[in-house]
Each structure stands twice: as structure tokens, then as C-alpha cells.
Amino acid sequence: MSLRSYMIYDEYNRKYISLYNYRTSFFSQQEKSLFDKIKSEIVSDDDFVIYGTDCKKYFLDYCILKNDLNVLDTLVLKYPWHAVIFDHSVSDFLVNSDGLVNIHQYILNFISANKIDHYEDILNYLLSHNIDISGHDNIAIMIAVQRKNLSMVKKLVEYGADIHANNDRALKLAVDDIEMFQYIVDMGADIHIDNDYCIRAATLIFNFDLLQFLVELGCDINIGNGYLLRTIINADFYYHRTITKNNVFEIVKYINVNSLGPHELTNCIHVHKNIELIKLLSDYGADFTFINKFCVMNEYEENVVDILKNHGLKYESILKFVLKYQSFMH
């Protein structure tokens, strides 16, 4: 195969433009005009040969990006694509047993790997051509779940897509979308998959609505010897403010607070300064007695306290000063 078969000719500048290492996300105006010219002149498969074998693949990419479904239909249905297997970027599993490229799988892979706002149109296009939407590890429904498109997920299920494929992977993809998650659970997904992955993930992304939903369904909130609560308590200040806003205290009531150590409890006092949470943890049995040992005064500190008391300072004022100092040091 000649080098020219991987190029298209720019008649205006009288030179060939290579498409071999071309990246579809960076179509220049010049390439766009050339693609428009090609599109207007497609009357037979021979036209692709004139412009180069590799042009087929990139023209397909371009049609997907531009949502040009009419031309996409022409490319997929009317012309053989056997020559595109010479393109090294097409994986072997995209080639059917007869040596032809699986175009539908290629399209699904392409929209999965690229952020395409109109992907729903393309999925509908594939459905309209009666393809096996559950094939290739159910990539179509995984795309819809990742894009948080519940209506498309339901439609794909109606067409035979398996919402439970790959060990309920769709459920794990939906941990940041409570509505999608609830739908998949209603379809029979296992909320305990992969050692309670869902409740762990919900904790890490601070999805408290999902946390409460999972607890109500029977997930073990004390999983990992207090992993959930320790993760929340050790969160940075921004997320800790979110805790109060999302009423996570209802969840804390069911947690064994004895899993918290001095590090977490010190964070509550000095870093987060969340008085509601400190009170709640104390009411539910958190052990703050480490402070007694931590705050044992040496001779110098006792002398300082005595001097301050003799000058009329109250214990409350001295304590407030110490707390402010500790807060500053943190």
C-alpha cells in the first residue's frame, strides 16, 4: 500500500495532507472543508479509494463528531470497510471472523472514549439499525450510565441491554447519581458487590443521600472497623461543612463511634470546629478522655497557669487561650 493511500489531496494548496496520525479532536478549518468536499462527491466506494483508504476511518470519526447521521448511514450501510483493518489504531477485536471491521462496535468505542454531547442521537441511530445492543460487554448501556442518562438506560434495557453485565458494573458507575442508582437497584442489582464497594465509594465522594439509602437497605455502616466515619471525620474543611448541610448526623447515630481515635477526635475539635458533631459524638460515647493524658501539664505550664490565676484570669479564659493557640498551630 503506497504512502499516498493514507493521504488526501488539498487542491487549493496543491499538496497531500497525511491522515495516518491524525487526531479527530483537532479538525482544522482546512480539513473540515476537505471533508465537506469529499462528502459532496461520494457516489461510490471508488471515491474513497481516490482519497485514500485511511480516509474512511477518519471520515467516520468526523461524521460522529459532527452528528452527521445521514452520511454516517451512507458510510456504514452502503460501503465495504475491509480496507480499514490496515489502520493500526483499530484493535483486532473489532474485526469480524470474515475479515470485515465491526463498525457498530467501532462507533460505540469512539463515543465512549470521547466526550460527545449528542451521543444519544448516535445510540438511537444504532438501535434503529437493529444491532445487538447487549454485545461487546454492554458498552452502550455503560456509556448511558456514565453520562447519567436514565431515559436512555431504560430504553437500552427495553432493547435487551444487560444492566447487570460485568458483575453489576453499571451500579458501581452510578454511585454519584442517586436516581440512576435507585433504578439499577430496583432492577435487582447487588448493593454488596465487591466487598460493599458502593457504600465505600459513596463515603469517599461524600454522597450522603446514597449513604442513607444504602444504610436503609441494610449495608453495614460500621464496615472496615469504622472506615466510613473515619473517612468523614478526616475530610478537609470544605467537605466537613457539607456534612452538616446534608444531615449526616442521622447516619452517625448508627455508627460505632468507639472506632474513632485521638487523631479523628482532635480533628473535630481543632480543624473542623464543628460543635454539633463534637456534641453528637460525645452523646454517643466517643472517648475524649485521651485529652486528660494529652493535657497533663509539666512544671512550667503549671507555673504559668498559677501566675495567670493569681492575676485574676479565670480557668475559662485560660482554656480559651489554649484552644485558640492549638487551633493556630494546626
Curated annotation (Swiss-Prot):
Record's keyword annotation contains Repeat: yes
Protein name in the entry: Putative ankyrin repeat protein L121
Keyword DNA repair recorded: no
SUPFAM superfamilies assigned to the protein according to its UniProt record, in alphabetical order: Ankyrin repeat
InterPro entries: Ankyrin_rpt (IPR002110), Ankyrin_rpt-contain_sf (IPR036770)
Lineage: Viruses, Varidnaviria, Bamfordvirae, Nucleocytoviricota, Megaviricetes
Coiled-coil zones: none
Renumbered ranges of ANK repeats: 55-84, 103-135, 136-165, 167-193, 195-223, 260-290
Keyword terms of this UniProt record: ANK repeat, Repeat
